[in-house]
């Protein structure tokens, strides 16, 4: 019986030390990971906005927390500025594609048009669902209107409020469409203030 207790105590001590070391490593790496994610988002918004904006600042933490509480798919919000003028907002949001969770960045301009779209992370099928990461797909978002509070999907988007749907990857492109429409009310809230 004593051997069982001794073995149990040894395992408990080893587990406690391992957990402590993991916590220490996590405390060092969490800031590095957060900074890398921030830089990846800013890079996406620099591509999305081009010369329409030159600064991307995180939205005030209290405002962001309120939005994230209300809109669960929102991960981050950026204020897009040209000089000191706010020209729009960038919203990172999640959705569920064919391969699982995806993270997208959408740039929304204060004139009611889309500055652009980029996929930040996905697990979609290579060559099919991953088309959402390619210029022929995301270039079609630029200038599309969301003035009516939503955008629509179409395989051949011609109307000002239609974004592309991909044949053979409808789940992926539907996830993008649903994600954008789900965060438009959040944009309305932050842009009205």
Segments predicted by a language model, with ranges:
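Flexible, solvent-exposed loop/hinge segments and secondary-structure transition points
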Residues: 2-193
């Amino acid at each position: 019986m004593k051997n069982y207790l001794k073995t149990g105590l040894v395992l408990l001590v080893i587990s406690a030390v391992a957990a402590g070391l993991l916590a220490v490593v996590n405390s060092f790496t969490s800031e590095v990971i957060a900074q890398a994610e921030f830089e990846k988002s800013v890079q996406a918004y620099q591509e999305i906005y081009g010369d329409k904006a030159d600064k991307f600042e995180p939205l005030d933490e209290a405002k962001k927390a309120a939005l994230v509480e209300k809109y669960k798919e929102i991960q981050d919000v950026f204020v897009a500025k040209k000089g000191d003028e706010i020209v729009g907002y960038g919203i990172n949001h999640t959705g569920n594609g064919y391969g699982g969770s995806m993270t997208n960045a959408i740039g929304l301009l204060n004139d009611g048009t889309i500055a652009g779209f980029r996929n930040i992370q996905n697990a979609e099928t290579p060559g099919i669902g991953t088309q959402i990461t390619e210029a022929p797909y995301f270039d079609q978002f630029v200038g599309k209107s969301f003035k009516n509070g939503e955008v629509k999907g179409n395989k051949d988007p011609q109307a000002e409020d239609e974004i592309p749907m991909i044949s053979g990857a409808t789940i992926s492109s539907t996830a993008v469409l649903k994600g954008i429409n789900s965060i438009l009310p959040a944009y309305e809230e932050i842009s009205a203030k």
